Amino acid sequence: MVTLKQISEICGVSVSTVSKAMNGQPDVNPATAERIRKVARDLGYRPNAAARSLKTKRSYLIGVLFADQINHEYFANVLDSIRNTAMDLGYDIMFVSDRVGNYKMSFYNHSAYRNCDGVIIMEARFEDPEVVELAASELPIVVLDHVFSGCVSVMTDNVASMVEIVHYVAGMGH
């Protein structure tokens, strides 16, 4: 496995400069950055997520707790939006469950075990003690269509949506 240190030695620059060039930082001379990226490509360099996580104290992993079928039309669209936004921001998505392989663990423990930077709770049994434990944890939590004290909530205004639908259908002459 090729390391930043090896690339820095070949290019005659510091490891920090290689890291900045690979991450698109603007304070590296463009010609130097391109040379570093070319050497990295030629050597088959692939970033190491574990090393990045140790350095940044972030996993770039967002957990999603979702209890319904993924083919649920509304939530499938929400999940697709979450995935696309996460990818745009350099994050991966992981589904939070109550086990890893054959090992049973709480939603909180699974999220902590995978070192999630945060968790989105949606379409869950909100009164479930494991969901309550996760919502009350130190992890950053966003909850869809439910309110937990201390968590950010994103709510859908179903009443306003229904009024809009009725007006639309009535306006179509139905």
Task: Tell me what each language-model feature is.
Residues M1-Y60:
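N-terminal helix-turn-helix DNA-binding module of bacterial transcription factors
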Residues N23, A136, H174:
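Short conserved AdoMet
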